[in-house]
Amino acid sequence: MIKKTTSFRLAIFGGSFDPIHYGHLICAMDCLEQISLNKIIFMPCSRSPFKKQNPVASALQRLEMIQLAIKPFKNFEVSSFEVQSPAPSYSIRTVQEFHKLYPHAELFWIIGSDQVPGLPRWKDYAELIQIVKFIVVSRSNYYPYEKRDYLVPLPKIRYVDISSTEIRERVKKELPIFHLLPQAVFQYIKENSIYIPNRTVHEK
């Protein structure tokens, strides 16, 4: 298992981020503070092996939206590793790469509690849990999971009921979204007509 003697703690926050919103940022900040992390890497995926559909926004658009959203946070960074790698995005490949880049760091991966039961189906699961620990963020309507050494529960949960799917649907219906994500991301979606071509993203 991962040794606990290292002083640098790095977490990878993977997802589609299609688009990134306040829920992602609050979750990341809670993990940073409660798990005493030094850095969080936002890792947009090209396509999840567990999802049939590709993200709606392009890889470049999602990277740029993340960059805009995390600009005020000095401990947050974004990586293009997965979107530049062949699809689908496998976590083991990402973890191996960051283990090489940060050989002396203690590595974590942020996941929702609903993902815990499916972890054994992740590619090279046995190797994965030797390299990385999973910070588990509990979500509503999901039962407690069995304790494991490689699972690190987030002590205090600030559940924010926002989803990227909801935001995309609101854009389609011409409903306001400015209250769900950072202003810079809202402006980017509006200016680039993301999620619904040739129509205006309404401010009110």
UniProtKB/Swiss-Prot annotation:
Keyword Mitochondrion: no
GO biological process, one term: NAD biosynthetic process
Keywords, ordered alphabetically: ATP-binding, NAD, Nucleotide-binding, Nucleotidyltransferase, Pyridine nucleotide biosynthesis, Transferase
Pathway it works in: Cofactor biosynthesis; NAD(+) biosynthesis; deamido-NAD(+) from nicotinate D-ribonucleotide: step 1/1
InterPro entries tied to this protein: Cyt_trans-like, NadD/NMNAT, Rossmann-like_a/b/a_fold
Highest taxon above the source species: Bacteria
GO molecular function annotations of the record: ATP binding; nicotinate-nucleotide adenylyltransferase activity
Catalytically driven reaction(s): nicotinate beta-D-ribonucleotide + ATP + H(+) = deamido-NAD(+) + diphosphate
Record keyword Nucleotide-binding present: yes
EC numbers: 2.7.7.18
Pfam families per record: CTP_transf_like
Family designation: Belongs to the NadD family.
Protein purpose: Catalyzes the reversible adenylation of nicotinate mononucleotide (NaMN) to nicotinic acid adenine dinucleotide (NaAD).
HAMAP family: NaMN_adenylyltr (MF_00244)
The protein's name in its UniProt record: Probable nicotinate-nucleotide adenylyltransferase
